[in-house]
Amino acid sequence: MAPKSVVNHPYGTRRFSFTFLLIGQIWLHLLQGKTCWRKISEHLFKTGPASMIPVLLVNVLAGMIFTIQTARQLESLGAINSVGGVFAIAFCRELAPILTASVVAGQVGSAFAAEIGAMKVTEQIDALYTLRTDPIDYLILPRVLACCATVPILIILGLVCGILGGIFVAAQFYQLPPLVFLESVRGFLKPIDIVNLGFKGVLFGAAIGAIGCGWGMTTYGGVKQVGESATAAVVVSGIAIFVLDLAVSLLFGDLPTGKPN
């Protein structure tokens, strides 16, 4: 039998294997209609409004910083009127989804791992089995669905706040009228960009929820191990967010199809 330190390693292969299997079980239970809707509404508040302030603050600041850097370069090229469009492309396609999902992973993913991990080490999960209650239906599926529903909304709100931050900086420091900024945004952004943004939000939400729950369910030991699981869940969720973002970019991005002449 493997030592406990190996079995409960924060980044052990056993945890990754369990989480991949858990994702399959989540799909199966979802297709069978097995979930606790009351629990979903409860977790919608925990993952949505509870995460809104840090998400909006991070996106506003990121929007202001990105606009400063972009406008500085475009002004030297005489293309300051295009700052809104360049900002919108980068922020909508990459920055808003990644920043928002990272904040949610830090706040919600760690909470899921800690909550379920604490239940695991205190044998509350075993008690659910005794009561013939499936933890996937009662604990995991509601959390994952709540993340899938709220992360896209938070990303859209973050995008709006980022644009507002960009408008403020462009107007205050570069004398670019807000209408010119917004017209540039409208000219560069396409409807497919918003669709991809929502698609990324669902993927990121599913990853955050599944990893947080998976790391919680594979926690053994005591309070120290619960903390380690929560920390590891945030790290793994962050990596998963970037991997999924790369996959979506490769699948749906406008990649060159041939070599230049």
Predicted segments — roles?
Residues H43-L99, V103:
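Active-site cofactor/substrate anionic-group-binding motifs, chiefly glycine-
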Residues V58-L61, A101, L141-A170, I211, ...:
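Hydrophobic alpha-helical transmembrane segments that constitute the membrane-spanning cores
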Residues I116-L141, V223-V226:
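Short cytoplasmic-facing helical segments at TM-TM junctions of multi-pass membrane proteins
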Residues G48, M52, L56, L95, ...:
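Selective transmembrane-helix segments that form parts of the transport pathway or gating/packing helices
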Residues Q69-C92, V160-V202, A210-A232, L251-N261:
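Membrane-interfacial helix-loop-helix connectors in multipass membrane proteins
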Residues A2-R38, W215-Y220:
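Short, membrane-interfacial amphipathic segments enriched in basic
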Residues V226, V234-S249:
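Final/C-terminal transmembrane alpha-helix of multipass membrane proteins
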